Amino acid sequence: MADRKTKIIAVLPAYNAEKTLEKTLADIPRADIDEILLVDDASTDNTVALAERLGLPVVRHPSNRGYGGNQKTCYREALRRGADIVVMIHPDYQYDARLTPLLTGFIERGVCDVMFGSRIRTRAEALRGGMPAYKYFFNRALTALENLVLGQNLGETHSGFRAYS
């Protein structure tokens, strides 16, 4: 647990993450996070058993609520536990969890209220990292449209690696 006034909780919205959970968890800098919580969306593999074996607190959905429902539970539970900053890290290993302090640090210092990480620096890197080609295509198209409408130049607006105050 970090020695600071700000309570930072990492939430892992999981669905069938058994194969990548342990690797993701190993990369989260524990000194910079006060608590890690897994929210399982009715996985059919051994995600919950593995998370419990790894010592993670687990919130389980009895039935699949979908991606949005899982995120809502993550944020609601983190706030209930007293989080000042919530960082969401998908346990699918498409994001570099070692960068967590970069996301939370800007928020903790009052520079901004929200930080988004990105798994898309290059197409090849995203695809090698496990992102299906169709998801890459639609992610890029939707992000381009959103940038056009919002007048921004964001790299990825649908990131599973983000932090909020």
Question: For each of these PLM feature ranges, what is it?
Answer:
Residues 17-20, 43, 96:
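Donor nucleotide-sugar binding loop of glycosyltransferases
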Residues 7-9:
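Cell-envelope/extracellular polymer assembly enzymes that use nucleotide-activated donors
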Residues 59, 63-80, 97-164:
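Acceptor/aglycone-binding surface of glycosyltransferases and processive sugar-polymer synthases
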